Amino acid sequence: MHTTFLQNIPLAKQKHQLFSGMRRLAFEQLNLKGYDVVISSTTAEAKGIITDERTLHISYINTPTRYLWSHYEEYLAHPGFGVLDPLARWQLRRTVQKARKWDFAAAQRPDVLLANSKHVQKRIQKYYQRESQVVYPVVDVERFMKRRHPRPRHVPDRYMLAVSRLVPYKRIDIAVQACEQAGYPLIVIGAGPQLKSLRKIAGPQTQFLGEVKDSLVEAYLQHASAFLFPGEEDFGITPVESLASGTPVIAYRRGGATETVADSVGVLVRQQSVAAFVRAIQEYDATCYDADILQLRAQEFSRERFIAELQRVVRASLESVG
């Protein structure tokens, strides 16, 4: 493994958002000479690596850079730096046009672009004006299927579950308020800067567990009545993990969830609102779902499938360039 100069800069890992300009430079300075194939995976700058003319560069785009394009206004409203938010807003406004020019140019460098969902494929066309192929990301579905965990202690007989970083765009606030209004217990696993504000709107129905070990996440998923997913994601790994656990998903009908959650495995909610999720929770009937069907759906996103599709793309791309 080869690292860049950013490895030695304090806070570059914990607060990487503050170092976007340096990240661009770091990727451009990587020595990638002599390789036949280079595969980059990116949500921002990694697609901007510079390769030899004879090198095939395939870039797996998890999303066009969110804070520059699709979610620019949202990042301005909630930068996520606490007391440094005013400084972050000023910096983003000051640099966004220059950053967009670099980001667009960087997206023209790879020979092949892969999108992690049809939703992202549309964004790639919109912001980068390039065609791409959809290869859904790998989900470790076997981890959630290989063994059944005992029911966690001190949990309600029935409960909704949310597993997420606690940041604004995940919309865990909708899950909390909807469960409180519906009178349905909710367990939230995860940490993040929004925890304090979420606690303020939570009532007796909601438990915040913070970060827990993997085996407990698996257990809570396996025994939940349903998994709540009120945010809009580019793909969304956790809904597939829920399906692999045999647990249906109640998700907002936008983004990657529309490609993973079908009627036979969950509920898609048309509006991203508390009222809409309250209705979905009140009308939800867990007995309508078959765990075997849910797990079969999850297996469509397995590691083996991902490897096979990626190998196919590499072979086809190499053949096309002779």
Q: Which ranges hold each PLM region?
A:
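Acidic anion/phosphate-binding donor-loop and adjacent secondary structure
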Residues: 126, 133, 139-156
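Nucleotide-activated donor-binding/catalytic signature segment of Leloir-type glycosyltransferases, i.e.
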Residues: 196-216
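Membrane-proximal helix-turn-helix segments that form the acceptor-binding/catalytic region
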Residues: 80-113, 121
